[in-house]
UniProtKB/Swiss-Prot annotation:
Interacts (via N-terminus, in open or in closed conformation) with unc-18; the interaction is direct. Interaction in open conformation with unc-18 promotes synaptic vesicle docking and tethering. Interaction via N-terminus with unc-18 mediates the secretion of the neurotransmitter acetylcholine from cholinergic motor neurons. Interaction with unc-18 is reduced in the presence of unc-13. The keyword Transport applies. Residues 195-257 form the t-SNARE coiled-coil homology domain. GO terms for biological process: cell differentiation; chemical synaptic transmission; exocytosis; insulin receptor signaling pathway; intracellular protein transport; locomotion; neurotransmitter secretion; positive regulation of anterior/posterior axon guidance. One of its GO terms (cellular component) is dendrite. Residues 290-293 are extracellular. It comes from Caenorhabditis briggsae. It is found in: Cell membrane; Cell projection, Axon; Cell projection, Dendrite; Perikaryon. It is a single-pass type IV membrane protein. InterPro entries: SNARE, Syntaxin, Syntaxin/epimorphin_CS, Syntaxin_N, T_SNARE_dom. It comes from the Eukaryota. This is Syntaxin-1A.
Length: 293
């Protein structure tokens, strides 16, 4: 009687443990599903930023190729830059939340958890992609600054004001567009148009520098994170690639084994049939030619 009760208690405990394991697996599966939904959302946001960066490049070219001040295109450019800034800050915030969650779970579970490794790899991949896009955006802005600076230099030359590169840089950094008009006679329409273009390019540079400063801290934070993760990601990618090669090789070997096994099985069947036929023939021969059988 006691043994029966003990067995029943063990069975009940085993069922409870199985239920707990099932609930834990279900919870983990749901968490990972939500995690991958978040990953796809972030990836989509980064792709949108990348597309907007390409649009910014087009606006830059349109502004510089237009001999007159194109206010509409500039407003569209300003809006694009504002959209990129908002989206970049959101992406950075979401990546930071994932990073904090990973660190918390790593302290609780250890680094050997399979789901945790998957999350770390996804986070690293997203971070690297984000930094690539923002690096391209930063380069786009600095290139545009240099092109605006070159445009100012050419317009000053046209106006008869010779300025060296260092002096021009100081004039730009002063933030005062009036420094460009000193010593220039503006009694013709052409001269006025030249100065208007210089002031417009100078304003563009001021906006660019403000935008670059606003994104600088975020950019450096993400760049440092990616650099620290680079070795880990490369190692994971190496292991994944070699694991894939191993699996491919194992699949090929398995196929060969199945083929060999199938051929061997066919040979056994053929041999068995041949032996059976021989036995039947011998039996018939014995019955026919040996009396008493």
């Amino acid at each position: 009687m006691t043994k029966d009760r003990l067995a029943a208690l063990k069975a009940a405990q085993s069922e409870d443990e199985q239920d707990d394991d099932m609930h834990m697996e279900t919870g983990n599966a749901q968490y990972m599903e939500e995690f991958f939904e978040q990953v796809e959302e972030i990836r989509g946001s980064v792709d949108i930023i990348a597309n907007n960066v390409e649009e910014v490049k087009k606006k830059h070219s349109a502004i510089l190729s237009n001999p007159v001040n194109d206010q509409k295109t500039k407003e569209e450019l300003d809006e694009l830059m504002a959209v990129i800034k908002r989206a970049a800050n959101k992406v950075r915030g979401k990546l930071k939340l994932i990073e904090n969650a990973i660190e918390h779970d790593e302290n609780q579970q250890g680094a050997g958890n399979a789901d945790l490794r998957i999350r770390k790899t996804q986070h690293s991949t997203l971070s690297r992609r984000f930094v690539e896009v923002m690096t391209d955006y930063n380069k786009t802005q600095t290139d545009y600054r240099e092109r605006c600076k070159g445009r100012i230099q050419r317009q000053l030359d046209i106006a008869g004001k010779q300025v060296g590169d260092e002096d021009l840089e100081e004039m730009i950094e002063s933030g005062n567009p009036g420094v460009f008009t000193q010593g220039i006679i503006t009694d013709t329409q052409q001269a006025k148009q030249t100065l208007a273009d210089i002031e417009a390019r100078h304003n563009d540079i001021m906006k660019l520098e403000s935008s670059i400063r606003e994104l600088h801290d975020m950019f450096m934070d993400m760049a440092m994170l990616v650099e620290s993760q680079g070795e880990m990601v490369d190692r994971i990618e190496y292991n994944v690639e070699h694991a894939k090669e191993f699996v491919d090789r194992a699949v090929a070997d398995t196929k060969k084994a199945v083929q060999y096994q199938s051929k061997a099985r066919r040979k056994k069947i053929i041999i068995l049939i041949v032996v059976t036929v021989i036995i039947v023939i011998l039996s018939l021969w014995l019955i026919q030619y040996i009396p008493g059988i």
